[in-house]
């Protein structure tokens, strides 16, 4: 996607959504303003910078935040019942002493070009928050659970809480619903969708380094229990089984796969075209060996996918190794 929008654009942590024949992606901007750029496309090949969600310092104050903090992983959704766009985003204030101090907000607009509502505070329960608009009008917010105690997995589980648009606040406290589809650990970037009576949860696992991957689970009830896809991970740069739940190293260079051009593949979201085609956008990197320096930083790739007869999402070639072309 960087090649499509221009190399001077930072396109990562992509959340992709469709309204009619229009495709939109929203991305992280960290400590930079204007915040949360939105790109637009008609064919998912040619993209242009369309608008920014956050343009006013009164909406979000990033002045004193250090590098790489600020706005993380916005989740762009469109609610058909309300004809409204929603963006859920987190502001990471600090990561000192392994304590992730994040505040999560939601912002709403009739037109994706704005004007956008004032941010509504959701919670500070964990980063990478996202929202599902259910068929019955209820709204669910999922995020990861960050554990600070020694000896506990960090992140630990995916949690969910209901959001009331009438009260403009969450209802109750987040509850754990999913502990991942692999043992790679570092579960994050949850996205809930609904299809054919199933709730699907898509997550990143393995950390943002070389053991990164995309996993899925599903359940008939939004609260679970969720069953993992039997072929998890569904997209990765390093196929195979590994146990890394207690490893604090997110980079994990030992998992570098020389057979793959795209490394660190994970943190994805999918979109379906009006004709039923399915595409997944995900994080990746292209390091130079042997130093494994990623001079272009984290990038975004796109994979063609398909739904199986059993109702699971697969890469179009039935593999799970992320492809460059």
Regions found by a protein language model. Name each.
Residues 1-325:
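Carbohydrate-active catalytic/glycan-binding domains of CAZyme proteins
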